[in-house]
């Protein structure tokens, strides 16, 4: 099936792995919420791959996409610049005065997941140290890697892409949100057969192995 005709809107955290799975489509990466808004406004996308399930489910409820399918999972991790100027060694250090915390905005999947983690850890007050609310996870990654923030929450898969520039601090399993990625074919697509074939490809062993190699978790 020829996939070069496809335009795929995908979560920023899929920037590296999707072209490795299939380099032929045209990809547009960004915050899942912003991409969904573009589809609602009539942008010519064939597929939406979101870093959560709620955004595509909302589009499905509105009749804009076919039934979303879960295709992978992820986890959150805290990153700090390699030099760690704020001397952050635990997530609990984020509540200290003067810490510059960079996060994604509410409504962006990783931003919502970040707030769940902080709440689960009893660290809602750390949000007082937020210096910027970004539009997607790659913006958080860049700010911390460049030393413009003392810490930020990203997906574990994103942290792997800037090894050597950041250090990571794990988050205990009990505080982790359920991070599931769902993909859906846009009903107005002019390439429905190719779009459905791409979704099928994501579920097959070769694509799943590439997702695992990039640090993503099995879909079930």
Region spans (language model):
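Exported/periplasmic ABC-transporter solute-binding proteins
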Residues: 1-28, 33-44, 50-63, 67-220
């Amino acid at each position: 099936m020829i996939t070069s005709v496809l335009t795929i809107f995908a979560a920023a955290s899929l920037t590296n792995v999707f072209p490795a799975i299939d380099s032929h489509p045209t990809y547009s990466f960004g915050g899942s919420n912003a991409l969904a808004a573009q589809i609602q406004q009539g942008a010519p996308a064939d597929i939406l791959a979101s870093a959560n399930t709620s955004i595509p489910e909302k589009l499905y409820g509105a009749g804009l996409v076919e039934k979303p399918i879960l295709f992978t999972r992820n986890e959150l991790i805290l990153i700090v610049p390699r030099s760690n100027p704020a001397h952050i060694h635990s997530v609990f250090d984020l509540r200290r005065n003067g810490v510059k915390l960079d996060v994604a905005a509410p409504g962006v999947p990783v931003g919502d997941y970040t707030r769940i983690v902080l709440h689960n850890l009893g660290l809602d007050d750390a949000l007082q140290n937020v210096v910027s609310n970004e539009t997607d996870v790659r913006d958080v990654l860049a700010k911390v890697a460049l030393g413009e923030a003392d810490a930020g929450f990203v997906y574990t898969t994103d942290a792997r892409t800037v090894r050597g520039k950041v250090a990571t601090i794990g988050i205990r399993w009990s505080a982790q949100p359920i991070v599931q990625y769902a993909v859906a074919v846009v009903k107005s697509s002019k390439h429905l057969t190719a779009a459905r074939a791409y979704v099928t490809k994501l579920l097959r062993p070769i694509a799943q192995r590439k997702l695992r190699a990039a640090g993503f978790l099995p879909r079930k």
